[in-house]
Curated annotation (Swiss-Prot):
Coiled coil: none annotated. One of the primary rRNA binding proteins. Required for association of the 30S and 50S subunits to form the 70S ribosome, for tRNA binding and peptide bond formation. It has been suggested to have peptidyltransferase activity; this is somewhat controversial. Makes several contacts with the 16S rRNA in the 70S ribosome. This is Large ribosomal subunit protein uL2. Part of the 50S ribosomal subunit. Forms a bridge to the 30S subunit in the 70S ribosome.
C-alpha cells in the first residue's frame, strides 16, 4: 500500500496523509461475521471514567476475527482484503473448502485467490498457520499465541511481526519489535509473514476533527488544569508544573517503569529496550 497526499483546497487537507485503499474491498462486510458494538465513552460499569479522552466517534460494526485458526488441515481461498475500523491492520475474508467463511488478519503480500491453511504440515508460506515447533528458525511470524489454544495475542497491529530466533527445552524464543526476547511454548501457533498496512505509522490525520471521528476527545494537559484536578494544576500565570511529571493521582509518568507481573517474568529472556 502507498501513501496518499491531497491537493490543499482546505487547510486540513494540506497536512492530511492517508493510506491508499484502492485495492481494498469497497462493499459492506460479510454480514454473518459482524456484530454490533456499543460505545462506553471510556466509562466502566459504575459509570466512572477509566480511560480518559474517549467518547463519540463514528458508529462501527465489529468484525469477528479468527485469531485461533482452529480449522485444521482444511485449505481456504482468500476472497477479498477488507478495511476494518476496529484495528489498524487490514483483514482477509477467506472461504474454506467446506464452504465456511472466516475473517483473518491479512499479512503483507497476501492477495485475492491465494490459498491458506492451518496445519502442522503446511508449507512455510504467507498466511499459513503452524505450531512454532514446525516453523524454521529465522522465520518472520505474526499473531503468535502465548497460551496453547487461546488464540494469537502478539504482533496483531499494522506492520508488526516477530522473529523466531531459537528453540530449546519445550520453548521457542522470539524477538519482538520492542527488542524484547521472550519464551513461548512450542505448541503455540503462529502465522507466517508480517501484518499488512505497514504505512499506517506514516499517516497524518490533518485535523482534530478526524481524531474525533475515531472516538478520541481532547487531551488536556495537567498544567492547564486547576489544583483540584491535577498535581500540575494552578499557579499564577503559565507554569512548568513545578515537579517531575506525574499522573493525576501523583504517580511518576513519562518513562517510569510500571510493569508488575512477576508471574510471567521468567518467560522474558531479555527486557525491551
Amino acid at each position: 500500500m502507498a501513501l496518499k497526499n491531497f491537493n490543499p483546497i482546505t487547510p486540513s487537507l494540506r497536512a492530511l496523509v492517508q493510506v491508499d485503499k484502492t485495492s481494498v474491498w469497497k462493499g459492506r462486510p460479510f454480514k454473518s461475521l459482524t456484530k454490533g458494538i456499543s460505545k462506553t465513552g471510556g466509562r466502566n460499569n459504575h459509570g466512572r471514567i477509566t480511560s480518559w479522552h474517549r467518547g463519540g466517534g463514528h458508529k462501527k460494526l465489529y468484525r469477528i476475527i479468527d485469531f485461533k485458526r482452529n480449522k485444521i488441515d482444511i485449505s481456504a481461498v482468500v476472497e477479498r482484503i477488507e478495511y476494518d475500523p476496529n484495528r489498524t491492520a487490514f483483514i482477509a475474508l477467506i472461504k474454506y473448502e467446506d464452504g465456511q467463511y472466516s475473517y483473518i488478519l491479512a499479512p503483507q503480500k497476501l492477495s485475492v485467490g491465494d490459498k491458506v491453511i492451518s496445519s502442522q504440515d503446511a508449507d512455510i508460506k504467507i498466511g499459513n498457520c503452524l505450531p512454532l515447533k514446525f516453523i524454521p528458525i529465522g522465520t518472520t511470524v505474526h499473531n503468535v499465541e502465548m497460551k496453547v489454544g487461546k488464540g494469537g495475542q502478539i504482533a496483531r497491529s499494522a506492520g508488526t511481526s516477530v522473529d523466531l530466533v531459537g528453540k530449546d527445552s519445550g520453548y521457542a524464543q522470539i524477538k519482538l519489535r520492542s527488542g524484547e526476547f521472550r519464551l513461548i511454548p512450542l505448541d503455540c501457533k503462529a502465522t507466517i509473514g508480517s501484518i499488512s498496512n505497514p504505512d499506517q505509522k506514516n499517516i497524518n490525520l490533518g485535523k482534530a476533527g478526524r481524531n474525533r471521528w475515531l472516538g478520541w476527545r481532547p487531551h488536556v494537559r495537567g498544567v492547564a488544569m486547576n489544583p483540584v484536578d491535577h498535581p500540575h494544576g494552578g499557579g499564577e500565570g503559565k507554569t512548568s508544573g513545578g515537579r517531575h511529571p506525574v499522573t493525576p493521582w501523583g504517580f511518576p509518568t513519562k518513562g517510569k517503569k510500571t510493569r508488575k507481573n512477576k508471574r510471567t517474568s521468567k518467560f522474558i529472556v531479555k527486557k525491551r529496550k
